[in-house]
Amino acid sequence: LLYREAVDIQGSIFRLTTLMREVTDEVQGHVKIAVASHVICPVFDEALTHFHARHPKATLSIDVDTSREAIAAVTARSASFAICLVKERNPKLEYRRLYREFFGLFCGPSHPLFGKTNLTRRDLAGHSSVSFETDRLHDVLKPVTLMRAAADMGDDIVGTSSHLEEVRRMIIAGIGIGPLPVHVAQRDVDAGLLWHLPPYDKMPEIDVHVVWNPRAKLNRAEESMLQELMGRIETIPIEERTYG
């Protein structure tokens, strides 16, 4: 409890220092965004474009973290907001679903299943896999764990990472079959670097959220950037924010 209070006080001091820098009418504040690795979302990109056009003197920094670290940064008020996966909701934070993605299984060019058609889940049985550190029954990628289990791939995970780019690297290197968001992997599929494996329907849905701390005193740049995102979330149907 004492530690949480100390983190809260430290965050408040950090926020006060940031707010005191804003003494002009023009928005010049800094926005620090914590994102999970490889967030591919046109809605987010459009919000960034519009924000910069409106406030060219405001600055941005985007830190790539695990989803857990991103949420911790928001809790500690050291990040303006986060874009990440959510396992359990903290009642002290606010959450809005930014987009939905679907995960599929992929292999690289040197894998024996690469390039083969008419495959079924049974063809994946016994093959080793690589995955994310959160690909566990008790964690945020539980649906992906169940997808691997349905293919009878077992628990033989020979490589893990918390970053999508490194999971992708291991898949392309032929270390094992691995999960990736379908819309993120499509470019590599088109380039002949990845091969999409079964299942091809009923793939696991994963929601990516915007997370912020309502107790944090945001500067005007942070407020504006958050409003850019919220406005799009409220007006664009989830069907148009679903990728895969």
Regions found by a protein language model. Name each.
Residues 24, 93-132:
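Flexible hinge/capping segments at coil-to-helix
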Residues 54-62, 148-158, 193:
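A local structural motif
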Residues 43, 195-239, 243-244:
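A late-sequence structural motif
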Residues 1-22, 231-234:
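Alpha-helical "hinge/linker" immediately C-terminal to small N-terminal DNA-binding modules
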Residues 28-91, 244:
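Central regulatory/effector-binding core of bacterial HTH transcription factors
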Residues 121, 127-152, 218-220, 226, ...:
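Secondary-structure junction motif
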Residues 1-5, 43, 47, 120, ...:
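Short amphipathic alpha-helical coupling segments at ligand-binding clamshell hinges
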Residues 90-97, 101, 166-215:
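Beta-alpha-beta core module
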